[in-house]
């Protein structure tokens, strides 16, 4: 119903026989088929956007972490983390700070919730000899008892087939290699009452995800539940992402966009999946809303 309400073309429910015609190695009682579903290369998109910004006279300031955004008299200034104030004044500012969105928003005068709790997700690439077993993208039916979607299959732009991600608490908002931890980030979620309320409600899901973190065999078994021919597939680690999961003080996960206006400053407090894939459409919406003021 949501797909139809949003005008997604061609989406329909199919039975097990048609499922096997579309994905011969996939088992299930039925499926929701979306023939126009697409994937993108986030890296290529980001690189092209950067090129366009520079072509239009814009600047991309690397190694310049933002401390807070200050508004006075209808003008917005950017104060860097070291206290230096950026030399340009803006009439509008849109903050898309991802994993740091709650901190930047609070320092800039917005409220402190929802808070970002980081969850990492590991992807694996399956053995080249098995990638033909899946033709497109296959997702499990979400279990409403658990907060995350589960392991799914994604065919990348380069033709490689990935499975993943799992979902487990990250011991650092920028801990992409999985070999370090940030004590300030750990204290930030461990001292948040909402985190413990969430954890208490989701112990079964936590144990299930922990198995996929410590055991690649468990990870493969999750995927093989609906593509049994991959039960013995070999996998190698691919990318590891960190999800900026917004969480309310009562432990509820925020599953929709949270866009807050604070004067002439707009904070994107939550942008759930598929935020990256849909980033251009989301950007158009945000800019359109800001320009209406």
Enumerate the predicted regions with their spans.
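Dinucleotide-binding Rossmann-like beta1-alpha1 core, especially the glycine-rich loop
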Residues: 1-18, 22, 28, 150-151, ...
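A general structural signal for well-ordered alpha-helical segments in protein cores
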Residues: 16, 46, 101, 219-220
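A short, glycine/Asx- and small/polar-enriched loop/turn
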Residues: 22-29, 70-77, 247-253
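Helical element adjacent to the flavin cofactor pocket in flavoenzyme catalytic cores
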Residues: 32-92, 96, 278-291
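Flavin-dependent oxidoreductases
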Residues: 69-183
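Flavin-binding catalytic cores
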Residues: 110-113, 130-131, 156-240
């Amino acid at each position: 119903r949501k797909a139809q309400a949003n005008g997604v073309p061609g989406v329909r429910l199919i039975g097990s026989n048609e499922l096997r015609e579309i994905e011969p190695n996939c088992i299930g009682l039925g499926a929701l088929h979306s023939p126009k579903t697409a994937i993108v290369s986030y890296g290529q998109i980001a690189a092209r956007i950067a090129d366009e910004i520079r072509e239009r006279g814009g600047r991309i300031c690397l190694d310049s972490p933002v401390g807070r955004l200050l508004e006075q008299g209808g003008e917005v200034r950017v104060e860097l983390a070291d206290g230096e104030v950026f030399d340009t004044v803006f009439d509008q500012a849109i903050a898309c700070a991802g994993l740091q969105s709650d901190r930047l928003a609070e320092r800039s005068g917005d409220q402190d919730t929802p808070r970002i709790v980081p969850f990492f997700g590991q992807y694996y690439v399956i053995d080249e000899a098995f990638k033909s077993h899946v033709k497109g993208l296959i997702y499990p039916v979400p279990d409403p008892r658990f907060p995350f979607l589960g392991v799914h299959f994604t065919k990348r732009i380069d033709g490689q087939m990935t499975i993943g991600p799992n979902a487990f608490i990250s011991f650092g908002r920028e801990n992409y290699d999985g070999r370090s931890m940030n004590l300030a980030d750990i204290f930030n979620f461990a001292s948040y009452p909402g985190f413990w309320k969430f954890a208490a409600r989701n112990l079964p899901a936590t144990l299930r995800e922990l198995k996929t973190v410590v055991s690649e065999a468990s990870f493969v078994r999750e995927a093989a539940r609906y593509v049994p021919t991959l039960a013995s597939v070999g996998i190698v680690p691919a990318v590891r992402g960190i999800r900026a999961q917004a969480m309310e003080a009562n432990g509820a996960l925020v599953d929709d966009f949270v866009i807050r206006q604070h004067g002439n400053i707009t904070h994107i407090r939550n942008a759930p999946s598929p935020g990256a894939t849909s980033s251009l459409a989301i950007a158009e919406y945000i800019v359109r809303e800001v320009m209406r003021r």
